Structure formats: structure tokens, C-alpha cells
């Protein structure tokens, strides 16, 4: 379906950006080659959850093998802060052009009013993550 193909492209870009960050910040070849494999394994609508596996490998390669996203620690707080800055800029621009931020694919939630944003800002996380690795 068009929806699944669109989602596949988003997942592919997210993983490609993760590879770029790791290339800038790490000398380890294994995570980069594994993320490249995940791109080639993306199926219709990412039914094999390559996005999730790639994210886990990416964050652990970047911040250490014990790192868990969304824990209550300084790194996660800094990531959330950086992502919020990007998200607010994108929300403003979407609203200016009259786009509906309530629409989304695969990331649905009754409490998340910005589903479209989840599709867009995760692709731009490349602008936040490397700075936390460096500092």
C-alpha cells in the first residue's frame, strides 16, 4: 500500500541518518554494517520491526551498551530537550501551511496530538544526537 511504502521510506531515512551519526562519532564497523543490513531487510510496513532493532543498536552504540531510551537520566533528558526544539519548529511550519498534525502512520496514540510530527522530526534527530556523544 502507499501508506506502507511511505512508512518504509521514513524508516529507511531514519536508519540512514543513524548510520551517518555513527560514522561521525564512532570507529566501530559492526553497528554500521548491521544498520545497513536492517535497511535492506525492511519489508512492507516494516513488519519485521527493523526500525526498533536499529534504534536499539544505534543508541547503545552511541551512548553505551547499557543505555535505554526513555530512562530518567541526563542523556535522555538532553535528547528530549533537543528533540523538543526541533519538534516545535516543525509544528510551527506545519501549522503555517495548514497541515493537520493529528494525522499519522504507525505511530498512533490517543494522547499524542502531533502524530505527523513523529514522522518528520525523527528524521532530523541527526542534528541533536552527535552533540551529546561529543560532550
Predicted regions and their residues:
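Active-site helix-to-loop segments that bind/position phosphate- or nucleotide-bearing substrates
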Residues: 1-135
Amino acid at each position: 500500500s502507499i501508506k506502507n511504502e511511505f512508512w518504509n521510506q521514513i524508516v529507511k531515512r531514519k536508519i540512514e541518518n543513524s548510520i551517518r551519526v555513527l560514522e561521525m562519532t564512532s570507529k566501530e564497523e559492526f553497528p554500521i554494517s548491521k544498520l545497513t543490513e536492517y535497511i535492506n531487510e525492511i519489508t512492507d510496513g516494516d513488519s519485521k520491526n527493523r526500525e526498533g532493532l536499529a534504534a536499539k543498536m544505534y543508541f547503545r552504540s552511541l551512548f553505551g551498551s547499557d543505555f535505554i531510551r526513555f530512562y530518567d537520566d541526563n542523556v535522555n533528558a538532553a535528547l528530549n530537550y533537543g528533540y523538543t526544539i526541533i519538534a516545535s519548529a516543525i509544528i510551527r511550519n506545519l501549522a503555517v501551511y495548514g497541515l493537520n498534525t493529528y494525522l499519522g502512520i504507525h505511530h498512533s496514540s490517543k494522547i499524542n496530538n502531533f502524530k505527523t510530527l513523529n514522522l518528520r522530526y525523527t528524521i532530523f534527530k541527526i542534528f541533536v544526537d552527535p552533540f551529546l556523544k561529543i560532550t
